[in-house]
Swiss-Prot record:
Organism: Homo sapiens
Subcellular localization: Cytoplasm, Cytosol; Inflammasome; Cytoplasm, Cytoskeleton, Microtubule organizing center; Golgi apparatus membrane
Effect seen on changing residue 152 to R: Impaired ability to activate the NLRP3 inflammasome
Phenotype for residue 324 to R: Complete loss of PYCARD/ASC filament nucleation
Residues of the FISNA domain: 140-210
Effect annotated for changing residue 359 to A/R: Does not affect ability to activate the NLRP3 inflammasome
Primary gene name: NLRP3
Effect annotated for changing residue 228 to Q: Abolished binding to small-inhibitor MCC950 and ability to activate the NLRP3 inflammasome following stimulation with nigericin
Recorded consequence of changing residue 262 to W: In FCAS1 and MWS; spontaneous polymerization into inflammasome speck
Catalytic activity: ATP + H2O = ADP + phosphate + H(+)
One cellular-component annotation, GO: microtubule organizing center
Protein's UniProt name: NACHT, LRR and PYD domains-containing protein 3
Length: 1036
């Protein structure tokens, strides 16, 4: 039988396989390519099968033809060419027509066996390469997991580490970036719509490289920006670990490579291949195969701000060959500028100080800002840090009581330092002193606990070592140097033995990957020691005479430091100066001298005060955030007498606040400011939605307890703009209003004050000590429910003269309640805005009664409401009353037609107080203007300003208006923009305006196409009558 014959032949071939080859044969049976149409044999059945059983299994599973094809293919795969060629020649003829229908890869004519053998080997080689790549990726992932699964605490003992997954606490990320210029423009235009319409967008780590929408391209470059200690590095390491663990970017990237920018910048010559090799677990990774698909590679470049060479746009020829050796900075610049492996993706971390420079190097990056910990995540971090739950709860409760310190803990580094200090205090049985309000205070406490002398000669040695650290830090800051060699340490009087001690205490961290290089554990610690360099009194024997050292130390003249502060290219000095202010606090100085047995100079206090005076009076300081930055310096000091003297130099304060820290800093400084004349605060709502939920508790907003203790003209002219205010915050803020003797203006526009907050404000406004005269509450989420409270204020507070309630849904019922207070004899309100308050004609009877009874109201703006002709007619009836003192009336976009113009005309002819009338956006038409002009031409009409923009006018009304212009003795401004007056109408105006009897000073026209004759007439008019201004307004 044929079946037996094929099985026997196949068994004989398998019998020729030695034990090793037979095992290989069975292995390939399990991994046989499925695209060849055969069923792989399960290991359980082949493992103990001999050659006969194996042949039978192969035929039973796949049939004779496919079983034979499998055997031939596997003979080639295990490199048994003899059996391959023999089986090819001995292959049975399948089917009645002798056609060979088995796999074409193994079926060919007799004379092409050699050719097929070579082709098959090439195919098997490709399979082997793919398998090898897959195997190497597996090996690389395992290495990355091993490398990044643990982190070392900065105060860890030798060999101690912490699981990254157990310690990591999720950070807030927002898809947000504003250039330096945009930030300045936003600060100068506080409260503008542009600012309000730019809410931040939270983004998850797994979506960083996803397109913005289905029509967009995927993102290839992501920039992580954030302040020092905000968590940029830990986030990058977490990304590496998650990818290697198979939970992140599995479908996007085959390889992630983590690059220390500061380490690479030290290398003189290195290729990208060398750089990739340094990231791999063995010396011979398949580099060629890795870079073959650059789109599947992600480079995580950590610390761009520490790569100084990358700032230089004229760095020289860039590298395009991944095998070519270049300087480290050129190599990274080539990657960033997409000259080297342009298809590869990049994730770059940087401090904001380097962001503007980085922006010029990138093409369409996605900017992501790290905001640190939310309140909930701060609590989570405490419970992860303390292994003992009771300790964690006690520590967190303690920090919650200190608002300032708790708020600072949004920065992960500060959170770690605070936890470390608390844990040390708990373990030693001591309680934490409640004096740590600033970063300086926290660092002083932390460092003093590590540097306590043991007495005797150690005290002298400690001072010498501390001086060495300070000079090393300052030298590094001025030379923008972060990594130091042992020779640098010797030049600053730090011997190798001294460094070992500091390593154990973690003032220095020895870099594992950069042998014989040392760095401060964090950039802020280097900045802290650099500040101390200007305060520590030098040892008598001096340090400038270190044997064999040619070291030239930076100048200790603090004026040199201060002169360079604030310069963009000297941005690295900002934190040094902040720490300097923090360290001259007298109590802090005494504490350090006692703890470290070192002398600290207080002589620079007057120089700092003088510098503040010069900066405060400089005109360029008006460009923010310079003023706020000076407040940060004063806040670090936490010495009220000094701060009060410094704040006397700020008669005008204009700052825009966008972070919690900004709130704290400004609040502290304003509380200590007694001579300010003008205050403008802008509070930007700059938090993702998850943070809004936390704000409902009102915790961080309570820090702004003060707006102004005593000022002669305190105008929060854009104060609290677009801020998320809560009732608890309002009580803290508004309590100041009842104690400030001269705070007269308060703007709370564009925030979520709401009716509850408004009730709190109204309580304060009724206080006898409240001197608010002007109050702006536009877009505050108010309704009719708060109108009774406002009415009580109007009937009791005789100081309030201006009130803006625009863009709040007060409704007709709310206005009825409001009018009760407006008609009260004690109400002195002069100006009232009710624009876009959801009003109808139903409220006009109440408003009209106010017009006829109020002795003070002179300006009423009720535009953007559906009052209609009937509603305006009711108002006009009372406005004709001789007792009506109304001077300005705004009826913009009120749904008016020519029907109401007779009523308006009668007011114009009888009310000599009315000087301004705003009617733009109403379809009055030419007929309406004709009626209006009857009143305007009356001798008793005193109107000075008339706005008729977008009133559906044509050239037909120009005769009536021309007659008005030659006759009116009062009209000075006429606005006719966005009306189709045509050339004929404008030419008519030109003739009239030339006349001496025309007293108009300002004419508004649409910016439209005029013929040559009309343009010439307008030009001639302005030449002949220079006192007349013609304004061309854009057509809507």
């Amino acid at each position: 039988m044929k079946m037996a014959s094929t099985r026997c032949k196949l068994a004989r071939y398998l019998e020729d396989l030695e034990d090793v080859d037979l095992k290989k044969f069975k292995m390939h049976l399990e991994d046989y390519p499925p695209q060849k149409g055969c069923i792989p044999l399960p290991r359980g059945q082949t493992e103990k099968a001999d050659h006969v059983d194996l042949a039978t299994l192969m035929i039973d599973f796949n049939g004779e033809e496919k079983a034979w094809a499998m055997a031939v293919w596997i003979f080639a795969a295990i490199n048994r060419r003899d059996l391959y060629e023999k089986a090819k020649r001995d292959e049975p003829k399948w089917g009645s027509d002798n056609a060979r229908v088995s796999n074409p890869t193994v079926i060919c004519q007799e004379d092409s066996i050699e050719e097929e053998w070579m082709g098959l080997l090439e195919y098997l080689s490709r399979i082997s390469i793919c398998k090898m790549k897959k195997d190497y990726r597996k090996k690389y992932r395992k290495y990355v997991r091993s490398r990044f699964q643990c982190i070392e605490d900065r105060n860890a003992r030798l060999g101690e580490s912490v699981s990254l997954n157990k310690r990591y606490t999720r950070l807030r990320l927002i898809k947000e970036h504003r250039s330096q210029q945009e930030r300045e423009q936003e600060l100068l235009a506080i409260g503008k719509t542009k600012t309000c319409e730019s809410p931040v967008s939270p983004i998850k780590m797994e979506l960083l490289f996803d397109p913005d929408d289905e029509h967009s391209e995927p993102v290839h470059t992501v920039v992580f920006q954030g302040a020092a200690g905000i968590g940029k590095t830990i986030l990058a390491r977490k990304m590496m670990l998650d990818w290697a663990s198979g939970t992140l970017y599995q479908d996007r990237f085959d390889y992630l490579f983590y690059i220390h920018c500061r380490e690479v910048s030290l290398v003189t010559q290195r290729s990208l291949g060398d750089l990739i090799m340094s990231c791999c677990p063995d010396p011979n990774p398949p580099i060629h195969k890795i870079v073959r698909k650059p789109s599947r590679i992600l480079f995580l470049m950590d610390g761009f701000d520490e790569l100084q060479g990358a700032f230089d746009e004229h760095i020289g020829p860039l590298c395009t060959d991944w095998q070519k050796a270049e300087r480290g900075d050129i190599l990274l610049s080539s990657l960033i500028r997409k000259k080297l492996l342009p298809e590869a993706s990049l994730l770059i971390t940087t401090r904001p100080v380097a962001l503007e420079k980085l922006q010029h190097l990138l093409d369409h990056p996605r900017h992501v800002e790290i905001l640190g910990f939310s309140e909930a995540k701060r609590k989570e971090y405490f419970f992860k840090y303390f292994s003992d739950e009771a300790q964690a709860r006690a520590a967190f409760s303690l920090i919650q009581e200190n608002e300032v310190l708790f708020t600072m803990c949004f920065i992960p580094l500060v959170c770690w330092i605070v936890c470390t200090g608390l844990k040390q205090q708990m373990e030693s049985g001591k309680s934490l002193a409640q004096t740590s309000k600033t970063t300086t205070a926290v660092y002083v406490f932390f460092l003093s606990s590590l540097l306590q002398p043991r007495g005797g000669s150690q005290e002298h040695g400690l001072c010498a070592h501390l001086w060495g650290l300070c000079s090393l830090a300052a030298d590094g800051i001025w030379n923008q140097k972060i990594l130091f060699e042992e020779s640098d340490l010797r030049n600053h009087g730090l011997q190798k033995a001294d460094v070992s001690a500091f390593l154990r205490m973690n003032l220095f961290q020895k870099e594992v990957d950069c042998e014989k290089f040392y760095s401060f554990i964090h950039m802020t610690f280097q900045e802290f020691f650099a500040a101390m360099y200007y305060l520590l009194e030098e040892e008598k024997e001096g340090r400038t005479n270190v044997p064999g050292s040619r070291l030239k130390l930076p100048s200790r003249d603090v004026t040199v430091l201060l002169e360079n502060y604030g310069k963009f290219e000297k941005g690295y000095l900002i934190f040094v100066v902040r720490f300097l202010f923090g360290l001259v606090n007298q109590e802090r100085t005494s504490y350090l001298e006692k703890k470290l047995s070192c002398k600290i100079s207080q002589q620079i206090r007057l120089e700092l005060l003088k510098w503040i005076e010069v900066k405060a009076k400089a005109k360029k300081l008006q460009i923010q955030p310079s003023q706020l930055e000076l407040f940060y310096c004063l806040y670090e000091m936490q010495e009220e007498d000094f701060v009060q003297r410094a704040m006397d130099y700020f008669p005008k304060i204009e700052i825009n606040l966008s972070t919690r820290m900004d709130h704290m800093v400004s609040s502290f400084c304003i509380e200590n400011c007694h001579r300010v004349e003008s205050l403008s605060l802008g509070f930007l709502h700059n938090m993702p939605k998850e943070e809004e939920e936390e704000e409902k508790e009102g915790r961080h907003l309570d820090m702004v307890q003060c707006v102004l203790p005593s000022s002669s003209h305190a105008a929060c002219s854009h104060g609290l703009v677009n801020s998320h205010l809560t009732s608890s915050f309002c009580r803290g803020l508004f309590s100041v209003l009842s104690t400030s003797q001269s705070l007269t203006e308060l703007d709370l526009s564009d925030n979520s004050l709401g009716d509850p907050g408004m009730r709190v404000l109204c309580e304060t406004l009724q206080h006898p000590g409240c001197n608010i005269r002007r109050l702006w509450l536009g877009r505050c989420g108010l309704s009719h429910e708060c109108c009774f409270d406002i009415s009580l204020v109007l009937s009791s507070n005789q100081k309030l003269v201006e009130l803006d309630l625009s863009d709040n849904a007060l409704g007709d019922f709310g206005i009825r309640l409001l009018c009760v207070g407006l008609k009260h004899l004690l109400c002195n309100l002069k100006k009232l805005w009710l624009v876009s308050c959801c009003l109808t004609s139903a409220c006009c009877q109440d408003l009209a009664s106010v017009l006829s009874t109020s002795h003070s109201l002179t300006r009423l703006y009720v535009g953007e409401n559906a009052l209609g002709d009937s509603g305006v007619a009711i108002l006009c009836e009372k406005a004709k009353n001789p007792q009506c003192n109304l001077q300005k009336l705004g009826l913009v976009n009120s749904g008016l037609t020519s029907v109401c113009c007779s009523a308006l005309s009668s007011v114009l002819s009888t009310n000599q107080n009315l000087t301004h009338l705003y009617l733009r956006g109403n379809t009055l038409g030419d007929k309406g203007i004709k009626l209006l002009c009857e009143g305007l031409l009356h001798p008793d009409c005193k109107l000075q300003v008339l706005e008729l923009d977008n009133c559906n006018l044509t050239s037909h009304c120009c005769w009536d208006l021309s007659t008005l212009l030659t006759s009116s003795q009062s009209l000075r401004k006429l606005s006719l923009g966005n009306n189709d007056l045509g050339d004929l109408g404008v030419m008519m105006f030109c003739e009239v305006l030339k006349q001496q009897s025309c007293l108009l000073q300002n004419l508004g026209l649409s910016e439209m196409y005029f013929n040559y004759e009309t343009k010439s007439a307008l030009e001639t008019l302005q030449e002949e009558k220079p006192e007349l201004t013609v304004v061309f307004e854009p057509s809507w």
